[in-house]
From Swiss-Prot:
Function text: Catalyzes the conversion of 3-deoxy-D-arabino-heptulosonate 7-phosphate (DAHP) to dehydroquinate (DHQ).
Source species: Marinomonas sp. (strain MWYL1)
GO molecular function, one term: nucleotide binding
Name listed for the protein in its UniProt record: 3-dehydroquinate synthase
Subcellular location: Cytoplasm
Pathway linked to the protein: Metabolic intermediate biosynthesis; chorismate biosynthesis; chorismate from D-erythrose 4-phosphate and phosphoenolpyruvate: step 2/7
Length: 368
């Protein structure tokens, strides 16, 4: 088992990474407050892992469960209300601990419920998808979607611990594994060129879920995110670099309908748009572009946006991005490979031509 810490002074917490560790009760005992536990999961994960976790924790705690429908389309205030109702109906008090057992949607909603139930109760993240293990479970972002925009309703609220069991990846559909790999690749692009180089060499074994290699990828991803979050918990500055590809990507997810494009797929296509724009601004070489395209494709990820979208769709959706400041759109771009920047200083001509060219290439590809 490997351990690292998200250093946030009195709100610091550990991240545990290992195979089979969801069954190590001591990890939970150290993070549970009081004697009540609410496990929030979904209909896909419940048959796989819920019974064993309830059995393990019921020895010392009153354990209740809340099983949600599965999918990004259910990341709504209505589903969040199901968690609140479950807590109230089972008479959970302020000393209860919420456990999020599932992927990013479960973690975001359970975390938001914990942040707001009786003005805040502790929670533990037990992420079961690669995307949630390397990204959404770490850093304290919680919330739900709105029809007009992704993650528009939420809170910053840190967990007591993140328990990453790599064994759960064995049940992950290939498409979900690829989606998670988009966030892994992102860390190499924004801040860690040696990691990017390593991913180029190891991607076939990572996609085959070699345990040592996937554990290393998760550890290095979490370490990169923990270092950024420790510097800027609430995204007032450097933390925004973690959103490479997300401004374009969220526009894709919202426009195409939540769940039709997985988050990681949208991030991959969005990252390529950001990288193309960075290249047009003279920050990257053609070799950088080719290497990045090849790496995303090795992970079975899209490198072009949906052919159905238009420049106008992107502009309208991106205007609601949380990084917009005083009416100006700010993008996460690359100053160089491994060096992300957040800027509103980009030529609109390059921005428009980047989108137009990518959309045209996507249309041509769809006709081929």
């Amino acid at each position: 088992m490997r351990t690292l810490t998200v250093d946030l002074d009195d709100r610091s917490y550990p991240i545990f990474i290992g195979s089979g560790i969801r069954q190590q009760k001591a990890l939970f005992d150290d993070a549970i407050h009081g004697k009540q536990v609410m496990i929030v999961t979904n209909e896909t994960i419940a048959p796989l892992y819920l019974e064993s976790m309830v059995s393990m924790l019921s020895v010392d705690y009153k354990v209740d469960t809340c099983i949600l429908p599965d999918g990004e389309v259910y990341k709504t205030l209505e589903t969040y209300g199901m968690i609140m109702s479950a807590l109230l109906e089972a008479k959970h008090n302020r000393t209860t601990t919420v456990i999020a057992l599932g992927g990013g949607v479960v973690g975001d909603m359970a975390g938001f419920a914990a942040a707001t139930y009786q003005r805040g109760v502790p929670f533990i993240q037990v992420p079961t998808t690669l995307l949630s293990q390397v990204d959404s479970s770490v850093g304290g972002k919680t919330g739900v979607n709105h029809p007009l925009g992704k993650n528009m309703i939420g809170a910053f609220y840190q967990p007591q611990a993140v328990i990453i069991d790599t064994e759960t990846l064995q049940s992950l559909p290939q498409r979900e594994l690829s989606a998670g790999m988009a966030e892994v690749i992102k860390y190499g692009l924004i801040c860690d060129v040696p990691f990017f180089d390593w991913l180029e060499q190891e991607m076939p074994e990572l996609m085959a879920l070699d345990n040592d290699k996937i554990s290393e990828a998760i550890y290095r991803s979490c370490l990169a995110k923990a270092n950024v979050v420790a510097q800027d918990e609430r995204e007032g500055g450097i933390r925004a670099i973690l959103n490479l590809g997300h401004t374009f990507g969220h526009a894709i997810e919202t426009e195409m309908g939540y769940g039709n494009w997985l988050h990681g797929e949208a991030v991959a296509a969005g990252s390529m748009l950001a990288i193309d724009l960075s290249w047009r601004m003279g920050n990257l070489t053609e070799q950088d572009i080719c290497r990045t395209v090849a790496l995303f494709q090795a992970a079975n990820l899209p490198v072009l946006p949906p052919a159905e979208m238009t420049v106008e769709c992107f502009v309208e959706r991106m205007a609601l991005d949380k990084k917009v400041l005083d009416g100006s759109l700010r993008l996460v771009l690359l100053g160089a490979l491994g060096d992300a920047i957040v800027t509103s200083d980009f030529p609109m001509e390059d921005f428009n031509s980047c989108l137009l060219d990518a959309l045209e290439a996507s249309k041509q590809a769809s006709l081929a």
